[in-house]
Amino acid sequence: MTVAMLAVAFKISGSSIGMWSIMLPGNAGTPFWGIPRSLRSDEFSVGTLFQLSQSHNGYAPISEILRGDLTDVRMVYGASCWSIITLFRPVLWGYLLFGFEFGLAFAWSAKLCLMVLVSFDCAFLIIKSKPLSLLFSCLLCFSPLIQWWGTGEVILYGQALVLLLDRALFTRKRNIRIIAMVAIAWLCGCYIMLMYPAWMVPFFFIFALMGVFRIIEYCQTLKSNDQHSVLAWSLSDTFVLVFCLLISAGLIFLSFFQSSEAMTSVMNTVYPGARFETGGSGLPELFSYAIPLFYAFDSPLVSNECEIATILCFFPLGTLASLLCFIKRRDWQLIVLTALQLFFLVFAFIGFPSFLSRITLMYNVPVLRLLFPIGYLELLLFLISVEKAKESQGKYSSIGYLPIILIIGLILSSAFQIFMLLSAKYLVARMLYLLMLMLFCLFSCLSFCS
């Protein structure tokens, strides 16, 4: 948190607002550190300018600056304003408390620092290894996908919910449990107010499973001889949690009611209002997790780095390794997470019938947006499998060959991405190369799961 405080104090952010010093004539000044990206026009010329306009509007919920007419900025535009909805958007609090410049630094720096900490703690609950949890946190939070999109609230709030649920369950103090339940209700509102179902829906499945894992472990603890180490769940705890959730739901309903006209207009649009996805278009970008690491320096092969930015997840190594580890160890948590991964992959590569897409809410998810949740889950599965293999084989085993395997995998992944971009019309050749990559991953899994 010291890093975040220093970044705010020195007004350091990841915004590309420095592009305006290039575009506006006679305007001097260059960024102190980093390169402004013209590709991030939706950030520096839309989102950030919304926040800047609000600083000249007294942070009122109705803007007289945007569009040159009265505009409700609470719900659709997601701008900072003195409104109930801002209670569920903590990233915007810096603008209201410190002004635009410090608020911009707060929105970038505090979010990233918290994301690193929360990702580490959440991964440790599942992986049970501090070094691997730290690796997970770094690979996730500093991935091309997070850095290019400048987002990540969905994993920040979702993982924080899992941690707070764990804290509420595995505690011996009633006041700690009450505080955790209040925070859970608030974070549920934060998650809903992200207003981006393309990521909210698949990540909901992931974090819901993690929450179920914690509940099952808590029940097992109560039944064991170690039951006195935790506080038993009581009926009063249920009432407190339901009461907090009802308050949060009431505030959310009030926020929607205040912006009902704007929401109705959005829902009546072709996009995103009439979106209905059934999947099946394929997701070859999953195999190109290596080369996006270098798009920050040069990207001559693509026109939009953001759309194919991924997480360094070693796909499909995690899925294959988890299946092999399950065969050997019968770890039910591992197989449940793998089943969810296969659920996403079936939607991406095969597709769902319309009724199944509607029932599962996956109709809100374009296939390309599955890069984020699939990459997240793949990285988690991979590191869980590594930890399971290390436990079964000992510290000095064939797991030592893993760095070499990963380096070769990264080279193959980069070659596949370049080959795919340069030879789009050679479908058969691409499929053969893809098969070679998958066979390599299978061989890699066998080398440390056998």
PLM feature segments, named:
Residues 16-156, 299:
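Active-site lumenal/periplasmic loops and adjacent helix-entry segments of GT-C-fold
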Residues 113-125, 129-219, 233-257, 407-414:
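Membrane-embedded helix bundles of polyisoprenyl
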Residues 115-123, 158-169, 208-213, 319-322, ...:
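Transmembrane alpha-helical segments
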Residues 168-180, 214-229, 356, 382-405, ...:
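Membrane-interface junctions at the ends of membrane-embedded or membrane-associated helices
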